């Protein structure tokens, strides 16, 4: 080894020992004749002193070094001078007096700073990601990710799950997003797909009698990106045989509870995890992934305002819409500009406008729409929303989906403005009873709302088989936390006839269904057990544990929102010979970027 200790290891117990360290020059301070260096590796920093009076050769050798040079130093550990200790540094009580030194590698001046955040553009940071990863914050996040995955593996093993790898080269089957396709050289004109998830394979493992499976699974989806999505992502894939919904929820809830307590003990959570139906989540929060760290519930005021003289409200109700409100505590003094700004937030969700009422100190209502309501109606609105003096009530009236989306935007924005979200609280919750089918207004048909292997709620099977699709619930469930969906799962179909029924709801011919899913239908003819599972997203979980809102922060080498790797310049063109071997050529008019 080129070192005897790491740069974060030395303490008072090591004083007077001769040690060798190796690492990067984090910072240099030249105090005339004496040179001070902060030497850095993954484990921490150690202050190094080069004194020419005791070691002129080492001082001369290190005279030309700059930040990020890689060096090796050997010397004696000594106590820092009184008053020079650094309580913020684990090694802050000692320093290393250099006896010999060696430059292992030089370094150009980095395009981004390592010893502090220089506010560089994200594109520059991603291009030089290997330098950004030297930063303390980034190394902390990668360490947190490692501990999270290790805890998952150890925990699943203790619970009797087997870790089994499933293929990366798979068959292309519709699972919601576009597949990444891989052409086959040995079978010209045919393609593999990279897995969007191991969904079918883990179900087939249950048919195989494996009973309890897990995998740290890499998944790829060719979809439009956003701050919490990447084209390739990692999930803890779980499947279990002979289980019902509560069994799966129990396993994942225990895992998450113990993981948070062990990996991030400063974080708190609410236990047991609350359960919301999908209908209630939409009704009260406008989202199937609500942030429950703060209240700001929606209140349906349709019954109160239906006989008012305010045409916006009555018009929405008469056309099948709804009117909902949120009480914003302490915001009654908002200026007209502040309210107009908030109305623009509501419009992002599709609202045409946003009505408001401010509650004055004497309990009276100040609002441009107050004149359209009787005093009894105003009192009812205050009572229904629990509004008090100094509060602001905001309203949106429109189609139910627009009201939900608009007030969800307002709710999240106000939580930021009022600083309502506790960053140290991991507020997990289960969302259950999702609709099994969605009405397609264009086709006039009811389409499956989930992947086609999701089981219908047992209580609604007969209703589904009668063709009464509205209100049929899926045996599916989501784990949400702090406004993000962390995991999605379901009890799976294991009965061939029900699986065939669901496949028949897909927009494919019987021949196409057999081509795409025949292997699943055949497997279910050989004794498939009842089974279910889910797949917590590791990237999003670590994102929350690390207190960041950008998933790229928690992935070693992420892609941009245009699915580009700026460091390796991918995707890139390939030469004509490679295409010919695959039986491919670029379509006319398609020109690679370079």
Curated annotation (Swiss-Prot):
Pfam entry (one): tRNA_anti-codon
Catalytic activity: tRNA(Asx) + L-aspartate + ATP = L-aspartyl-tRNA(Asx) + AMP + diphosphate
Residues annotated to bind ATP: 221-223, 230, 485, 537-540
Chief site of localization: cytoplasm
GO biological process terms on file: aspartyl-tRNA aminoacylation
One MF term in the entry's GO annotations: aspartate-tRNA ligase activity
TM spans (from-to): none
PANTHER family the record matches: ASPARTATE--TRNA LIGASE, MITOCHONDRIAL, ASPARTYL/LYSYL-TRNA SYNTHETASE
NCBIfam families: aspS_bact, PRK00476.1
Protein name: Aspartate--tRNA(Asp/Asn) ligase
UniProt source species: Herpetosiphon aurantiacus (strain ATCC 23779 / DSM 785 / 114-95)
């Amino acid at each position: 080894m080129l070192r005897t200790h790491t740069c974060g290891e030395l303490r008072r117990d090591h004083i007077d020992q001769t040690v060798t360290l190796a690492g990067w020059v984090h910072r240099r301070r030249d105090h005339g004749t004496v040179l001070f260096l902060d030497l850095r590796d993954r484990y921490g920093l150690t202050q190094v002193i080069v004194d020419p009076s005791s070691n002129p050769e080492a001082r001369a050798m290190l005279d030309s070094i700059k930040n990020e040079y890689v060096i090796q130093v050997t010397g004696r550990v000594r106590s820092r001078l009184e008053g020079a200790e650094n309580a913020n540094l684990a090694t802050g009580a000692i320093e290393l007096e250099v006896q010999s030194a060696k430059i292992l590698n030089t370094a150009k001046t980095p395009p981004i700073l390592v010893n502090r955040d220089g506010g560089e553009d994200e594109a520059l940071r991603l291009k030089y990601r290997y330098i950004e990863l030297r930063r303390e914050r980034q190394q902390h996040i990668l360490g947190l990710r490692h501990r999270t995955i290790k805890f998952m593996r150890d925990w699943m093993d203790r619970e009797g799950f087997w870790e089994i790898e499933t293929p990366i080269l798979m068959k292309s089957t519709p699972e919601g997003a576009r597949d990444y396709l891989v052409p086959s050289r040995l079978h010209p004109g045919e393609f593999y797909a990279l897995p969007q998830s191991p969904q079918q394979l883990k179900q087939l493992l249950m048919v195989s009698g494996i009973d309890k499976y897990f995998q740290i699974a890499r998944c790829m989806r060719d979809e439009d990106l956003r701050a919490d999505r990447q084209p390739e992502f990692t999930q803890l894939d779980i499947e279990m045989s002979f289980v019902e919904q509560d069994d799966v929820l129990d396993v994942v809830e225990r895992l998450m509870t113990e993981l948070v307590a062990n990996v991030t003990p400063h974080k708190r959570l609410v236990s047991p995890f609350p359960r919301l139906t999908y209908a209630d989540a939409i009704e009260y929060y406008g989202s199937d992934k609500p942030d429950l760290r703060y209240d700001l519930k929606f209140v349906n005021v349709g019954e109160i305002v239906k006989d008012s003289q305010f045409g916006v409200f009555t018009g929405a109700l008469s056309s099948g819409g709804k009117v909902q409100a949120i009480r914003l505590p302490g915001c009654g003094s908002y200026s007209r500009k502040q309210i107009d700004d908030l109305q623009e937030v509501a419009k992002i969700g599709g609202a045409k406008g946003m009505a408001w009422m401010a509650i004055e100190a004497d309990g009276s209502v100040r609002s441009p729409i107050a004149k359209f309501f009787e005093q009894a109606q105003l009192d009812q609105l205050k009572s229904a929303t629990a509004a008090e003096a100094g509060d602001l009530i905001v309203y949106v009236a429109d189609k139910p989906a627009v009201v939900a989306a608009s007030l969800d935007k307002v709710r999240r924005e106000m939580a930021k403005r009022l600083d309502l979200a506790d960053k140290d609280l991991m507020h997990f919750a289960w969302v259950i009873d999702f609709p099994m089918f969605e009405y397609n207004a264009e086709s006039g048909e009811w389409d499956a709302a989930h992947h086609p292997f999701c089981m219908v709620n047992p209580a609604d099977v007969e209703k589904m088989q009668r063709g009464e699709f509205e209100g049929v619930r899926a045996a599916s469930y989501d784990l949400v936390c702090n406004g993000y969906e962390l995991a999605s799962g379901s009890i799976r179909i294991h009965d061939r006839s029900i699986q065939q029924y669901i496949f028949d709801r897909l927009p494919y011919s019987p021949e196409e269904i057999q081509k795409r899913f025949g292997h699943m239908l055949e497997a279910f003819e050989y004794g498939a057990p009842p089974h279910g599972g889910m797949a917590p997203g590791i990237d999003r979980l670590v994102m929350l544990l690390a207190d960041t809102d950008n998933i790229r922060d928690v992935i070693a080498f992420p892609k941009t929102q245009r699915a580009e790797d700026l460091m390796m310049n991918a995707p890139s063109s390939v030469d004509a010979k490679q295409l010919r071997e695959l039986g491919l050529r670029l379509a006319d008019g398609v020109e690679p970027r370079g």
